[in-house]
Design a protein with these regions (language model features):
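RecB-family 4Fe-4S metal-dependent nuclease core
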Residues: 1-153
Length: 153
């Protein structure tokens, strides 16, 4: 598009970060490979490519707790990438993220959206980390037993 300045910051960029849960101080690592990171008119965008068909509704949510659903796994993945990018960069930034599906190229970049907002600030990512911490805490809670979630089948 005319007037848009894009700078490629990374292709197949390996990201990782070490985090600690607030409650029990459990240390854990996140790592992943982002297909593309770019700056578009000064806005950082995390982009994941999918070879199959993909629908934009899978990237929309209102509360972070929704991301535990198998139907929102791509949104969860993108937020993990955003959190890792944020933790590896000292500047206070706002991130956008999305998916480009090769089978739905006509849709262009399908943006990750929380309550119709496509920007994820440091504060938003801190709130997502709290959700991630809860998951880690549950995994390590010896008082909880694991069972298959019927709703995820």
């Amino acid at each position: 598009r005319k007037g848009i300045e894009i700078e490629i910051l990374g292709i197949e960029s390996k990201l990782n970060t070490e985090l600690v849960t607030e409650k029990s101080k459990i240390k854990y690592k996140l790592k992943g490979t982002v297909d593309r990171i770019q700056s578009e008119n000064g806005i950082i965008k995390i982009i994941d490519y999918k070879t199959g068909s993909f629908q934009p509704y899978k990237l929309s949510f209102k509360e972070y707790e929704e991301l535990v659903s198998k139907k929102k796994k791509e949104a969860f993945q993108l937020l993990c990438y955003c959190l890792m990018y944020d933790k590896n960069n000292e500047k206070q930034i706002s991130l956008n993220a999305g998916i480009i599906s090769f089978k739905n190229m006509n849709l262009g970049l399908m943006s990750l959206k929380k309550s119709n907002s496509v920007s994820f600030t440091n504060d938003e990512l801190s709130t997502f980390k709290e959700t991630l911490d809860k998951i880690i805490e549950e995994i390590f809670d010896t008082n909880l037993s694991f069972s298959e979630n019927e709703s995820l089948k």
